[in-house]
């Protein structure tokens, strides 16, 4: 069992605003948010098709116009994590928590706040997930040529940022093919979250999941890359792959992963059903965004996104500790009979948890006649 908690201070940064349209998955019939708009200074139109959605449960944001934000909101980053082997013989999960990138990397001129997180759920042994934990920071911020931080976050920077993420995942995949201690049957999922000022970027390959809490409502920031995800199923079948009992080519439960070169080697890079390329989602954080949960399938196999958000939100209102919230979410998954390795990271965007407003008591006023007042005074005087 591993617990950790860190915290950094807030600072000011120029950012952009994005207008988003959100639609919930079929199992969340009550949830429908037509529009989230931060300010009029910047607009972003929604694009994408049913075949290539960009976000987890239907959220899509694509920037078309960039400007300086009129909002004063700057997130204050603090996080906590929890990991447990459960009933498995080995622990194949690993994770990264960096609440202050500038302090961690030193030579980079990051905006403040800046933070980076990752969850890696290994299979076929722990080596692939360990490799990601030990090397991904270097791959992201050195080998993939992380873009220079501009004075104002614009569309060009966001495109470069997305490209550097894709390159980092590809470099990790290729490096693992050359790593002698990682066997060809060993691999890992990879879920990362990068925060720069108010900008949040989530990259995912596999079935770990990132879930944002927006005023108590769960917003999936990533897809689960499994046979149940229809766009992935079609992609696999178009490339000649197949599913047997939900497993890719009868072997693997996920359709995207780092490593697993025994499955990738018979194909060229463009035709392998199993790929390492991440799906990427970007969003601008607002005052409505309370926290982000990153967790492996040991959590999501037994808890819905909304149940997890409600659990963490209640915990933050009780004690305000993201580390304890991560542990409590893991314990809830264990109570629901999850036997898999589990890893949870809870990332808060404010220093003080939001509390529900208490209803004001109604003030009652009474009018008393002179006769009634005289009788009351006489009663009190004992007459």
Curated annotation (Swiss-Prot):
Residues that coordinate or bind Mn(2+) 2: 121, 297, 340
Binding positions (Mn(2+) 1): 121-122
UniProt KW keywords: Hydrolase, Magnesium, Manganese, Metal-binding, Protein phosphatase
Disulfide bond entries: none
InterPro entries: PP2C, PP2C_BS, PPM-type-like_dom_sf, PPM-type_phosphatase-like_dom
UniProt GO MF annotations: metal ion binding; protein serine/threonine phosphatase activity
Pfam families: PP2C
Enzyme Commission no: 3.1.3.16
Top-rank taxon: Eukaryota
Listed cofactors: Mg(2+); Mn(2+)
Textual note on the cofactor: Binds 2 magnesium or manganese ions per subunit.
Keyword Heme: no
Catalytic reaction equation(s): O-phospho-L-seryl-[protein] + H2O = L-seryl-[protein] + phosphate; O-phospho-L-threonyl-[protein] + H2O = L-threonyl-[protein] + phosphate
Domain PPM-type phosphatase positions: 78-349
PANTHER family: PROTEIN PHOSPHATASE 2C, PROTEIN PHOSPHATASE 2C 13-RELATED
Protein family according to the UniProt entry: Belongs to the PP2C family.
Name of the protein in question: Probable protein phosphatase 2C 13
Native source species: Arabidopsis thaliana (Mouse-ear cress)
């Amino acid at each position: 069992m591993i617990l950790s908690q860190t915290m950094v201070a807030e600072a000011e940064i120029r950012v952009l605003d994005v207008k988003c349209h959100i639609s919930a998955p079929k199992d969340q019939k009550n949830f429908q948010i037509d529009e989230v708009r931060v300010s009029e200074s910047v607009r972003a139109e929604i694009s994408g098709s049913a075949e290539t959605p960009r976000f987890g449960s239907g959220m899509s944001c694509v920037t078309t116009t960039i400007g300086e934000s009129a909002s004063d909101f700057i997130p204050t980053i603090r996080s906590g994590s929890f990991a447990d082997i459960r009933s498995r013989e080995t622990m194949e999960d690993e994770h990264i928590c960096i609440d202050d990138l500038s302090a961690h990397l030193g030579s980079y001129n990051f905006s403040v706040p800046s933070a980076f997180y990752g969850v890696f759920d290994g299979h076929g042994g722990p080596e692939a997930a360990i490799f990601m934990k030990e090397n991904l920071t270097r791959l992201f911020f050195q080998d993939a040529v992380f873009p220079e931080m501009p004075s104002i976050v614009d569309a060009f920077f966001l495109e470069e940022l997305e490209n550097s993420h894709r390159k980092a995942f590809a470099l990790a995949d290729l490096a693992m093919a050359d790593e002698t201690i990682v066997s060809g049957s060993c691999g890992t999922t990879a879920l990362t979250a990068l925060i720069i000022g108010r900008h949040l970027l989530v990259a995912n390959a596999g079935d770990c999941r990132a879930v944002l809490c927006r005023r108590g409502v769960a917003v999936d920031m990533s897809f689960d890359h499994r046979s149940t995800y229809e766009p992935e199923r079609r992609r696999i079948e178009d490339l000649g792959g197949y599913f047997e009992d939900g497993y890719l080519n009868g072997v693997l439960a996920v359709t995207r992963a780092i490593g697993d070169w025994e499955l990738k080697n018979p194909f060229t890079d463009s035709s392998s059903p199993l790929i390492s390329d991440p799906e990427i989602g970007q969003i601008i954080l607002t005052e409505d965004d309370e926290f982000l949960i990153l967790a492996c399938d040991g959590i999501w196999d037994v808890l819905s996104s909304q149940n997890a958000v409600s659990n963490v939100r209640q915990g933050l209102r009780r004690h305000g500790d993201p580390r304890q919230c991560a542990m409590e979410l893991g314990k809830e998954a264990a109570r629901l009979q999850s036997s898999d390795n589990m890893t949870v990271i809870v990332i808060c965007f404010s220093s003080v948890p939001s509390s529900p407003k208490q209803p004001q008591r109604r003030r009652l006023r009474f009018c008393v006649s002179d006769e009634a007042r005289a009788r009351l005074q006489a009663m009190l005087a004992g007459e």
